[in-house]
Amino acid sequence: MNIDSKSGMCLVKVLLILFTFHFSLFTSFAQNADLQKAVAKYKKTTTVTAAATKTSHKDAIAKDVVTKGTLTMKKPADVSISIDGGKDQLVMHGSEFTMVVKGKSHKTSSQTNPQFATFQAVFEYILKGGEGDLSKLSDLAVTKQGNNIILTITPIADSKKAQRRMLFSSFVLTIDKNTSELKALRMNERGGYTEYTFTGHQFK
C-alpha cells in the first residue's frame, strides 16, 4: 500500500512538472507570436521617427531631470535617440554603440561588450518586422501587459567583476501591440535609471 501511495505521489509530481513545462512553453510561444504580430508593420517601413522625452532618475536626488529630443529608427540596424540638441545621444549603428553624455562621447561594441548584444538583436528583430528567432536569447523575457508587449533584457555576466563593470542592469522596451509603436525604453542602472518615452510616431 505504501509503495502504491509513493508511486502515485511520484506520478502526480511528474504530471505537474510536465504540465508546468508545457504551459510555460505554450505561454512563451503565445507571447512571441504577440510580439511578432506587434512588429509586423516594420516589414513595410524604412524609417520611424518620433518625439522623445528623457527622464533621468537618481535615487539620491529628489527631482528627476527631464529633457526633450527625437527618436529615429532606420533599416537595417540604426537607432538614434538625440536629446537636447545632441548634447545627449544614444546611437546604435549595427554592432557599434555611441553614448554622448553632456557632450562627451563614449563608444563600445556588442562584439566586445556582450551586454549590448541582445539589445542589438532585439532592435534588429523589430526593424525587420519580426524576422528571426529571439527564443534562444536567455537574457530576454517577453511579457504582455494590457495592450503593451514588454521586452526585458537582463544581461548575464560571467563573473562578479564583469557584473560590476556593466553600465546597465537591465533594459526594458515597451511596444504597443496595436499600433506597433515603441512607447518607451528604460535603462536601469545602479542607483537610478534613464527612461525615454516616445510619442507622435511617423512610419515611412
What name fits each language-model region?
Residues 70-121, 194-195:
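An acidic-aromatic
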Residues 136-204:
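Gly/Pro-enriched, hydrophobic low-complexity segments
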Residues 1-11:
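N-terminal secretory signal peptides that target proteins for export/translocation
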Residues 66-68:
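Low-complexity, intrinsically disordered segments exposed to solvent
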Residues 26-30:
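Sec/Tat signal peptide C-region and signal peptidase I cleavage site
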Residues 33-36, 40-47, 51, 56-57, ...:
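Flexible, processing/modification-adjacent segments and terminal tails
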